[in-house]
From Swiss-Prot:
Record-listed UDP-N-acetyl-alpha-D-glucosamine binding positions: 13-16, 27, 84, 89-90, 151, 166, 181, 239, 344, 362, 377, 388
Species per Swiss-Prot/TrEMBL record: Corynebacterium efficiens (strain DSM 44549 / YS-314 / AJ 12310 / JCM 11189 / NBRC 100395)
EC number per UniProt: 2.7.7.23, 2.3.1.157
Name listed for the protein in its UniProt record: Bifunctional protein GlmU
Residues annotated as the enzyme's active site: 374
Disulfide bond residue pairs: none
Chief place where the protein resides: cytoplasm
Gene name for this UniProt entry: glmU
One record GO biological process: lipid A biosynthetic process
Length: 486
């Protein structure tokens, strides 16, 4: 439901302790698919474009409050926060939320911060069903093959909801009902306010139950109805780590399927993990063991993996990234990366460039067509176009106190095992010999070499390491050399 609905508000309940998670992190802050549980719920709420969104927080509010504010910033809209000082039941939580909805008289949807699979479409269908006919409360329900543990929905002959009966209180006939309560509701705001003021805590838990609103509404002659969700999986709550993993797997299945239907080939969906904010172009090939995290963007016709993890990366059209771990960086069009490449934040590889095996980069800008083929560290550096960095080279950027910058020009060729002692600049078209330690700037077109002439000390092994295998091998080799005299 994308159009603005000025007559709706959404309340997200996220005040519980979530003790079954056995975590120092508040339950709704655990993540699947690159978002926290409460972020998923707030995104679903925002998809309705309601007048107000209210998050009710309590336990761990020092953690949850800033997280809600971050999501609101990401959504570009206000999310009001209500504090439930004492966790005294779902009815009390909604009472706390109503302070943020003073004067609002439309439809209030109440959902939970631990149902990450619930979509805006399903909330929209609930809202549409609720407003189609005058209704006090509409319960979002689901049909389950095994309803054990859930509150059963009891309807009358007209299809109205007469009761929600909990498992422990249900008769055998009621236990056979497969339609159950999801814990998500749509309320008429005026009726909800009145009913909330009448809630009592005369129950085994001594709490105020939101479900008691239904009985109050019916006792006053207001209709209570149910709307069955099309996909019960959306309403699966997360209460422990097992359910967190199950929800994550289901969300990933959806995300991977959407990518394939959008034109990407995913060789093995079972070993491919894609966060919900990842974007993937057409004719992309994703090989097994690939993880695409955060806001990663994959251009058309790129190939990713196998065994690759990319977080907040931008991959250009036609690029190939194989057996690579990369984050917060950009790979240009038709560039090649891997295998066994480590791309740290701030790397920008130009179009048609190459980062090869066992190369590590950090805060490095590498120009179009330039290559770093193997066994090299490039940190705090700028490399121009069409340059080649020899194997086993190191950009020595740290002097023990500061990180320093190296600048390599275009069309530069450096020999293997070159050390660049930053800060240093190598001009366009320059070369370096193998094993060179570059401490001073190299002018354009110059050849940089360091070190003296090679010196061989004859017979050193036999004198210093007599009796060793090396000495014996040397002696045998020397004795086999033909005598050139006479």
């Amino acid at each position: 439901m994308s159009a603005s609905d000025s007559s709706s508000a959404v309340v997200v309940l996220a005040a519980g302790a979530g003790t079954r998670m056995k975590s120092d992190l508040q339950k709704t802050l655990h993540s699947i698919g690159g978002r926290s549980l409460i972020s998923h719920s707030l995104h679903a709420a925002a998809g309705l474009n309601p007048t107000h969104i209210v998050a009710v927080i309590g336990h761990g509010r020092d953690q949850v409050g800033p997280a809600v504010e971050d999501v609101a910033t990401h959504l570009g809209r206000e999310v009001r926060i209500a504090i439930q000082e004492e966790q005294n039941g779902t009815g009390h939580a909604v009472q706390c939320a109503m302070d943020q909805l003073e004067g609002f008289d439309g439809t209030i949807i109440v959902t939970n911060g631990d149902v990450p699979l619930l979509t805006s479409d399903t909330l929209g269908s609930l809202l549409a069903a609720h407003t189609a006919t005058p209704t006090a409360v509409t319960v979002l329900t689901m049909n389950l093959d095994d309803p054990t543990g859930y509150g059963r929905i009891v309807r009358n002959a007209d299809g109205e909801v007469t009761a929600i009966v909990e498992q422990k209180d249900a008769s055998d006939e009621e236990r056979s009902i497969t339609e159950v309560n999801s814990g998500v509701f749509a309320f008429d705001a005026t009726i909800l306010r009145s009913a909330l003021s009448q809630l009592k805590s005369d129950n085994a838990q001594g709490e105020l139950y939101l479900t008691d609103v239904l009985g109050i509404a019916r006792s006053e002659g207001h209709p209570v109805r149910a709307h069955i969700a099309a996909d019960a999986r959306e309403l699966a709550g997360v209460n422990d780590r097992v359910q967190l993993a199950e929800a994550g797997a289901e969300l990933n299945r959806r995300t991977v399927e959407a990518a394939m239907r959008g034109g990407a080939t995913i060789v093995d969906p079972a070993t491919t993990w894609i966060d919900v904010e990842v974007t993937i172009g057409r004719d992309v090939l994703i090989n097994p063991g690939t993880q695409l995290r955060g806001t990663t963007s994959i251009g058309d016709r790129a190939e990713i993996g196998p065994d690759t993890t990319l977080t907040n990366m931008v991959i250009g059209t036609g690029a190939s990234v194989i057996r690579t771990h990369g984050s917060d960086s950009e790979i240009g069009e038709d560039a090649t990366v891997g295998p066994f490449t480590y791309i740290r934040p701030g790397t920008k590889l130009g179009a048609e460039g190459k980062l090869g095996g066992f190369v590590e980069t950090k805060k490095a800008t590498i120009g179009r067509g330039s290559k770093v083929p193997h066994l090299t560290y490039v940190g705090d550096a700028t490399i121009g176009e069409y340059s080649n960095i020899g194997a086993s080279s190191v950009f020595v950027n740290y002097d023990g106190v500061n990180k320093n910058h190296t600048t390599i020009g275009s069309h530069v060729r450096t020999g293997s095992d070159t050390m660049f002692i930053a800060p240093v600049t190598v001009g366009d078209g320059a070369y370096s010999g193998a094993g060179t330690v570059i401490k001073d700037d190299v002018p354009p077109g110059a050849l940089a070499v360091s070190g003296g002439r090679q010196r061989n000390i004859e017979g050193w092994v036999q004198k210093k390491r007599p009796g060793t295998a090396a000495a014996d091998a040397a002696a045998a080799a020397q004795n086999s050399v033909p005598n050139q005299e006479g």
